[in-house]
C-alpha cells in the first residue's frame, strides 16, 4: 500500500494499530512488529498480534526527530550566513531578532515549524531572547501547526533595553520573569517551559547561581551557549582564569538541569566535568560546517557518558541532512585520523536525533522513543525508493541514504500534522504566499551586516 487517503483516515482515528515492515525501537530496527496508539499515547509496541492492524508494506515507522537547538526568530535569515565568519549572532541574528514584532515573530515561527515538520521534526528546543508578547506569538504558531515545543525566555541580568542602552535586572525582576514564562507555557500541554542565559557573560556569578537554583526548583531546563567560538573562550579565560565549562563547574551550576549548546571547543578536562555532573549538550554538526570554529567531540561525549542530542541551530530544518552531518563530522574530524570507519556505527546518530535529544531537553519521560506509555510522535517513512534498495542495514541506510521526501506522514501526539509533505489541518501554501513579503522584510532589518555578501560578488568576471 502506497501513500493514500486510507492511511490518513486511519491516522485520524482515536485508536489505530499499524504494522509496517520496520519499526525503529530503542533496541534497533524490528520486523514483524506493530504499534498501537490510543488517545495520543503509544499503548503497545511489539510482535504483531492484532487482526485489525493496518499493514503498511514498504514503510518504516521511526521516532520523530527532536531538534535539540534552534532559534525560531532566525527563520528568514538562514541563507544570509553563507560565507560569513563566526559570531554571526552579533551582525545578523541580534539585529534580526531585535526587530521582531508579535506579528513577525508569529510568522517566523510558523514558517520554521512547517519547515521542521516537513523535515521530520516533531519537537523543537527553541532558544530565544523573547519576552512575553513575542513568546505568546510563537506559542500560537505552535498550536496552529501542532508541533511540540520547548519554549524559552532569555533571563539575562545584563541586557540592552529598547532604547539601545545597557541595563541591569534585579533578582526580583528575574524571578518574576521566570514565573511569568512558566504561566504562559501552562496554556498548552505541548509547550514545555525552559529558561535561557544567552552566555556566561550576560549574568553575573550570583545571578547564574540563583537562576540555576530556580530551574532546579521548578524542574525546568536552563539553556546556555557554551564553548562555541574562540572569542568566548578567550574572554572567559581572561576574566576568570578558567574556560567556560570550568567556570560553570567552579560556581556549582553544572548538572542535568542545564542544556549546554555547542560545546565544540572543549578540553578533556571539560568533558570529564560534563560527565561527572551529568550535564547534557546539543551537538550541532551543520552549524559547525557552515558557521562554526570546530566540531564537538560527540563520540568522546558518548564514550565518557555525556548525554547529547542533535541540533540544527537554524541551519537546515531537514532532519536527514542533520543526521548525515552528525556522522560525517565525526568521521572526518575524529575518526579518519585514527582509521576508525565505524564512526558511531549509525545507531549512535539515529538514537541521538530522537531519544538523545529528548534526554538532553529533559522530556524523555514523554517523547523520544517508540515505547508504550510515551506520546505518539513518529514518522511514516517510505522504504521503497531506489536510493534505499535493496536494504541490508536499515540504520546505516537511514543515516546515509534516506531523504526528507521519503517522509509520507508526520504524527505528533497521535495526530497527523503533515501528510505527503503538506500540512493536514491548515493551508500552508496560502500562508507562504501571504507572508513571503514579510519574510524578505524581516531578513532586511537595517542593522543587519553581511561581511561576506552574496555568492555572486565572489564569482570571477567572465
Annotated model-derived regions:
Residues 1-50, 60-61, 454, 460-462:
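N-terminal metal-binding scaffold of metallo-dependent hydrolase/deaminase domains
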Residues 36, 79-147, 173-187, 434-440, ...:
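Alpha-helical scaffold segments that flank or form the walls of functional sites
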Residues 128-132, 194-210, 289-290, 360-362:
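Active-site glycine- and acidic-residue-rich loops that bind
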Residues 375-425:
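C-terminal cap of metal-dependent C-N hydrolases
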Amino acid at each position: 500500500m502506497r501513500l493514500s487517503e486510507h492511511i490518513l483516515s486511519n491516522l485520524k482515528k482515536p485508536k489505530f494499530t499499524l504494522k509496517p515492515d520496520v519499526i525503529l525501537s530503542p533496541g534497533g530496527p524490528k520486523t514483524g512488529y506493530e504499534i498501537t496508539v490510543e488517545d495520543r499515547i503509544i499503548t503497545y509496541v511489539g510482535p504483531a498480534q492484532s487482526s485489525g492492524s493496518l499493514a503498511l508494506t514498504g514503510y518504516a515507522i521511526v521516532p520523530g526527530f527532536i531538534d535539540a537547538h534552534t532559534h525560531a526568530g532566525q527563520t528568514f535569515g538562514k541563507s544570509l550566513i553563507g560565507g560569513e565568519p563566526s559570531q554571526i549572532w552579533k551582525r545578523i541574528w541580534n539585529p534580526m531578532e531585535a526587530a521582531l514584532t508579535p506579528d513577525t515573530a508569529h510568522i517566523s515561527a510558523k514558517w520554521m515549524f512547517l519547515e521542521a515538520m516537513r523535515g521530520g521534526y516533531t519537537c523543537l528546543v527553541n532558544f530565544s531572547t523573547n519576552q512575553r508578547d513575542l513568546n505568546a506569538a510563537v506559542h500560537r504558531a505552535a498550536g496552529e501547526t501542532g508541533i511540540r515545543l520547548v519554549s524559552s525566555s532569555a533571563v539575562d541580568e545584563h541586557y540592552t533595553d529598547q532604547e539601545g542602552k545597557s541595563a541591569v535586572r534585579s533578582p526580583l525582576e528575574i524571578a518574576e520573569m521566570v514565573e511569568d514564562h512558566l504561566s504562559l507555557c501552562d496554556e498548552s500541554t505541548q509547550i514545555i517551559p525552559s529558561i535561557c542565559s544567552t552566555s556566561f557573560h550576560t549574568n553575573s556569578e550570583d545571578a547564574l547561581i540563583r537562576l540555576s537554583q530556580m530551574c532546579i526548583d521548578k524542574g525546568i531546563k536552563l539553556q546556555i551557549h557554551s564553548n562555541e567560538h574562540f572569542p568566548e573562550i578567550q574572554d572567559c579565560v581572561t576574566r576568570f582564569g578558567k574556560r567556560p565549562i570550568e567556570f560553570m563547574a567552579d560556581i556549582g551550576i553544572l548538572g542535568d538541569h542545564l542544556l549546554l549548546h555547542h560545546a565544540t571547543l572543549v578540553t578533556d578536562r571539560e568533558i570529564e566535568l560534563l560527565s561527572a555532573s551529568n550535564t547534557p549538550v546539543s551537538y550541532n554538526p551543520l552549524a559547525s560546517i557552515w558557521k562554526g570554529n570546530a566540531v564537538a567531540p560527540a563520540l568522546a561525549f558518548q564514550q565518557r557518558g555525556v548525554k547529547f542530542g542533535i541540533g540544527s541551530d537554524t541551519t537546515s530544518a531537514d532532519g536527514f541532512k542533520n543526521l548525515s552531518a552528525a556522522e560525517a563530522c565525526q568521521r572526518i574530524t575524529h575518526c579518519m585520523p585514527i582509521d576508525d570507519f565505524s564512526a558511531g556505527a549509525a545507531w549512535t546518530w539515529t538514537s541521538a536525533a530522537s531519544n538523545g535529544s529528548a534526554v538532553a531537553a529533559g522530556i524523555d519521560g514523554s517523547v523520544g522513543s517508540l515505547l508504550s506509555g510515551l506520546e505518539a510522535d513518529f514518522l511514516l517513512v517510505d522504504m521503497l525508493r531506489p536510493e534505499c534498495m535493496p536494504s541490508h542495514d536499515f540504520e546505516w541506510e537511514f543515516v546515509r541514504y534516506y531523504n526528507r521526501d521519503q517522509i509520507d506522514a508526520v504524527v505528533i501526539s497521535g495526530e497527523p500534522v503533515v501528510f505527503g509533505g503538506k500540512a493536514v489541518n491548515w493551508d500552508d501554501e496560502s500562508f507562504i504566499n501571504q507572508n513571503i513579503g514579510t519574510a524578505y522584510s524581516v531578513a532586511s532589518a537595517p542593522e543587519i551586516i553581511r561581511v561576506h555578501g552574496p555568492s555572486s560578488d565572489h564569482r570571477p568576471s567572465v
